[in-house]
Amino acid sequence: MGMTITEKIIAAHAGRDYVEPGELVTVKVDLAIANDITAPLAIKQLEKYGIDKVHDPNKIALVMDHFFPPKDIMSAQQIKISRDFAKKMGIKNYFEGQDSGVMHTLLPEKGFVVPGDLVIGADSHTCTYGGIGAFSTGVGSTDIAYIWATGETWLRVPESMKFVFYNKPQKWVGGKDFVLTVIGKIGVDGALYKAMEYQGEAIRALDIDNRLTIANMAIEAGGKSGIIEPDEKTVDWVRKRTNREFKLYKSDPDAKYCCEYEFDASKIEPVVACPSLPSNVKPVSEVAGTHIDQVFIGSCTNGRLSDLRIAAAILKSKKVHPEVRCIVIPASDQIYKQALHEGIIEILADAGCLISTSTCGPCLGGHMGILAEGEVCLSTSNRNFVGRMGHPKSQVYLSSPAVAAASAVLGRIAHPDEVAKYEEVETLITL
């Protein structure tokens, strides 16, 4: 029996030739990561047991992104604890402020993750790195502390689900629409502890930004991980960012999947996830006209350069609706600088967008865009649970950057066709 890409990566890191779903294995970890919320908890565990050194400081990365810049005394203290720990342990991969960003955008951008890696993070959206062919998943702070101390962890080998997208997608449709369509189909618990593997010509046609978006939201279906087989696009993208050696893994033709789904990409419309679950997915056409108070374009899901390009292409020479605050947060300093260089920031600012330094910010209801009672936000982030972005009686819809930008102009949920001609902005859109 053959193995899936996920099983092959786990087997390699377990020192095994073969693994199968359900097995408990101990694996070596290539990178163990945490943020300003989860790192202090892990540090506390190490201190509790008198552990005064880490296994390998070069295989640890700490990124201050959730409440950065510090929004209050407590968040400032959390960051200080993390900073002091990094200095004490000789951890050079510590990111705060300058040349930093949102963790799951920053780390692959800087070449810290390559295809075939096994990455564990104290953050649920660690699954993002599957977009470049790594096995990555989230754990709690106690598990991260153990990895920091030993360099390894245990896993139960997950079953794999296969999602095949074929045919050419419609205009305006990209990775966010694909993954929301999947979650709408299987539900928020439809992939519990499963590896969600994406295949097909429509997936291969996507750029890396869109692939990372798809992998990012595996956890919204309960998935252990999301993964896309690396190809020439992946290799080119990674090679521009690191000289690290890596191995490309692919699923065997006779690999076993617990279930398989097929989607005709040509029939998928731009979609939104309605309150208050990522699985409450409907075509934009069914909810067009819904009033909004805020638009958020950013996060580890859709704050990359291609996302800002499409938002700027739609908003160029237009104005954000006067009753809407449109918050745009580039997901890394590098993305911000490139957007500045390309004139994207100027276009967004002229349109009336509020542009922030890189932070998770409003995505988790942390700061810089909190919702009041009764307010409605259309967000390009990944979660829309009750109270996710503010007051329990606020509401959050999820969409692609294209839908978000169009909606910001009209002050209501809108299809991009209502405000822009696809042919005029197509050169800025890479799907």
Swiss-Prot record:
The keyword Lyase applies. Its cofactor is [4Fe-4S] cluster. InterPro entries: Acnase/IPM_dHydase_lsu_aba_1/3 (IPR015931), Acoase/IPM_deHydtase_lsu_aba (IPR001030), Aconitase_4Fe-4S_BS (IPR018136), Aconitase_4Fe-4S_dom (IPR036008), HAcnase/IPMdehydase_lsu_prok (IPR011826), Homoacnase/IPMdehydase_lsu (IPR006251), IPM_dehydratase_rel_enz (IPR050067), IPMI_cat (IPR033941). Gene3D superfamilies: Aconitase, domain 3. Disulfide bonds: none annotated. Heterodimer of LeuC and LeuD. Catalyzes the isomerization between 2-isopropylmalate and 3-isopropylmalate, via the formation of 2-isopropylmaleate. PANTHER family: 3-ISOPROPYLMALATE DEHYDRATASE LARGE SUBUNIT 2, HOMOACONITASE, MITOCHONDRIAL-RELATED. It catalyses: (2R,3S)-3-isopropylmalate = (2S)-2-isopropylmalate. Its EC number is 4.2.1.33. Pathway: Amino-acid biosynthesis; L-leucine biosynthesis; L-leucine from 3-methyl-2-oxobutanoate: step 2/4. The keyword Lyase applies. Binds 1 [4Fe-4S] cluster per subunit. Keywords: 4Fe-4S, Amino-acid biosynthesis, Branched-chain amino acid biosynthesis, Iron, Iron-sulfur, Leucine biosynthesis, Lyase, Metal-binding. PROSITE patterns: ACONITASE_1, ACONITASE_2. [4Fe-4S] cluster binds at residues 300, 360, 363. This is 3-isopropylmalate dehydratase large subunit. Belongs to the aconitase/IPM isomerase family. LeuC type 2 subfamily. One of its GO terms (molecular function) is 4 iron, 4 sulfur cluster binding.
